[in-house]
Amino acid sequence: MKTFSAKPQSVTRDWYVVDATDKTLGRLATEIARRLRGKHKPEYTPHVDTGDYIVVVNAEKVRVTGNKAQAKNYYRHTGYPGGLRSMSFEKLIDHAPERVIESAVKGMLPKGPLGRAMYSKLKVYAGAEHPHAAQQPLELNL
């Protein structure tokens, strides 16, 4: 019996919607990253993007444990000398709640062109509304 290897043109992708309300950030991000990679499918192939599309709603209601709300910092650089900026989880969840989930998931995906293709299938929205109703996403309970 030969080992199955998925071809990029033969991959079928589903759309899923995930509600992040009162979910722990890391536990939610690991399951999202797993599904973006396609590791939940029997036809998973490491060098082919076999993952599904994931729409995350209510990103502003995601939780962290312990004192991470104050202690966890997110860093970015403006591109100018001395341009390192940091923001705590508390401030970032008020300012741009999508970035919290996006950065957690992005760190769990492969680095390189394949990882960027997987990351592009992640859609995160702060509120309960999303513009992907035409894709008829399935509810995913994590």
UniProtKB/Swiss-Prot annotation:
Keywords: Ribonucleoprotein, Ribosomal protein. It holds the Pfam family Ribosomal_L13. GO terms for molecular function: mRNA binding; structural constituent of ribosome. GO terms for biological process: negative regulation of translation; translation. One of its GO terms (cellular component) is cytosolic large ribosomal subunit. It comes from the Bacteria. InterPro entries: Ribosomal_uL13, Ribosomal_uL13_bac-type, Ribosomal_uL13_CS, Ribosomal_uL13_sf. Belongs to the universal ribosomal protein uL13 family. This protein is one of the early assembly proteins of the 50S ribosomal subunit, although it is not seen to bind rRNA by itself. It is important during the early stages of 50S assembly. Part of the 50S ribosomal subunit. This is Large ribosomal subunit protein uL13. It comes from Chromohalobacter salexigens (strain ATCC BAA-138 / DSM 3043 / CIP 106854 / NCIMB 13768 / 1H11). The lineage of its organism: Bacteria, Pseudomonadati, Pseudomonadota, Gammaproteobacteria, Oceanospirillales.
